[in-house]
Amino acid sequence: MKFKSIAFALAAIAAVAAKAPASAADLELLEAGKLQVATEGTFPPFSMRAPDGSLDGLEIRVMTEVAKRLNLTYTPVLIKWDSLLVGLQADQYDVISASMDITAERQKKVTFANGWLESGGRIVVQADSPIKSAADLKGKTVGALVSSTFAKIAEDKGATVKGYKAESDAMQDLVNGNIDATITDSIAGAYAIKNAHMPLAMTDDFVSRIQKGFAIKKGKPELVKAINKALADIVADGTYAKLTVDLIGFDPAPKEPIQSVE
């Protein structure tokens, strides 16, 4: 009887431990019980404000679910695009979740969790623009996020690049006629044109094919592993599809996610 009591007690302790928040030491978190995540809040449908003022969007939903799977509280930190990497290196948050493309150059500075979304770059123009493809960008003024993949693409095409700290500012400048085009994520562009009722259009060609990743400061392998497992579980059990299809009408999970490189 005594042994049974001990067994029950051990089982109860194990159950509590399984539900307990991961410790800061285990996952190299800045604060125990919290997953502090940098996001912009200005890039629909990835990160934006819902009608009630709360944060919503693809990356908000997915990262909130990741935190839940890790028994952590999702804690957003609103940061402008050009300060994201600096803040991560300064330990202002644990993860960057800001529609960041996984590139070889960025992999030298941060560790990305496995790719969580597949998309591509598209050119957005005014509805009556003569720009029909990337070949037409030469000599034009093209808006793009500062230090982004799309800014480099526009520059390589011979365009004069105007940098922005928020995608929404570039789209509005395009509507106002201050730039000739902007290059943005295809999902974001389609969402803005449809839901913000902007008089804009996208050209047919993709200027890039990309995967987006959650960025983590180098030297935190346990946190990377934990996020990768949570992402895989979310996709496998159908939760990812439910979270994303509801917002954009399809499942953007990569068929072959780019793997983490320390």
PLM features: residue spans?
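Extracytoplasmic small-molecule ligand-binding "clamshell" domains
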Residues: A24-S99
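Extended ligand-binding regions for polar small-molecule ligands
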Residues: I60-R69, V146-T149, G213-P252
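Alpha-to-beta junction loops
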Residues: Q36, L72-T73, A90-A98, K140-T141, ...
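Flexible hinge/capping segments at coil-to-helix
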Residues: V125-V142
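Short helix-initiation/N-cap motifs at beta->coil->alpha
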Residues: I60, P76-V86, S129, V146-S148, ...
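A ligand-binding cleft/hinge motif common to bilobed small-molecule-binding domains
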Residues: S83-V86, A98-K108, D180-S208
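Periplasmic-binding protein-like
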Residues: L117-V125, A190-A232, F250-E262
